[in-house]
């Protein structure tokens, strides 16, 4: 049981890491070619990586919540709290980047696509 849960955690971690690398490469290439503005590229990459990571956080243990017992229910509740914090943080981040960068439409379209 423990080995299975650890293996699921490892595969999820690997998928999250590969997606984050792909997003960063794609976004970096697009931003350098279009605007040559690296800060917006980094912000959007971190945003998408965090959003993907914490949206799949509840899937780190498999099975239904009633089958996994008290520990899994506690982690599910914790993940919802973390999701809310990340969502509020990304809203704040969107306002900050929209204030300081002139390329607001790019960030907004990319963020809407990820949500």
From Swiss-Prot:
Keywords: Membrane, Signal, Transmembrane, Transmembrane helix
Main location: membrane
Ranges that cross the membrane: 41-60, 81-103
Coiled coil spans: none
Position of the signal peptide: 1-34
Membrane topology: Multi-pass membrane protein
Subcellular location(s) per record: Membrane
GO cellular component, one term: membrane
Disulfide pairings: none
Function: Has a role in meiosis.
Protein name: Meiotically up-regulated gene 106 protein
